Each structure stands twice: as C-alpha cells, then as structure tokens.
Amino acid sequence: MYNPREINIKKDFTIQQKIDPGKVQIIVLDGNQGTAHVLDAPEHGKTVIQTVKGSFARVDHEIGFKVK
C-alpha cells in the first residue's frame, strides 16, 4: 500500500505517471542512481524520505487516525 514502486524513466530522462483520482502520491526522483519511485501518501500522517550517501534509501510513515 505505502511501498514505493519503481517507475520507468524514458531515454530523455522524463517520466510519465497517471494521477489516480482520490489519492495523493509522492514521486521520488533519484538523480544519483537514475531511478524514480512512486508511493501513496497516508490519509493522515507524515512521510519521511531518507537518503544514504545522497541516494534514496528508505521511506518512513507516521500514520495517525482521526477520532472524530
């Protein structure tokens, strides 16, 4: 659900990604490794993108639930 999935990068270094109605998505572009990833943002919460030596390494979610 919140796991990043790799998306294709074209030869001219562009990406094409559909917008899914009703969703907020995050696109991570890693110029060091030449990769692109997309993941869904949680409905309520924070998303932290972590890097190691300048490259995309990890995604942490702090998810909350609205009580009322």
UniProtKB/Swiss-Prot annotation:
Pfam families: PBSX_XtrA. To B.subtilis XtrA. This is Uncharacterized protein YqaO. It comes from Bacillus subtilis (strain 168).
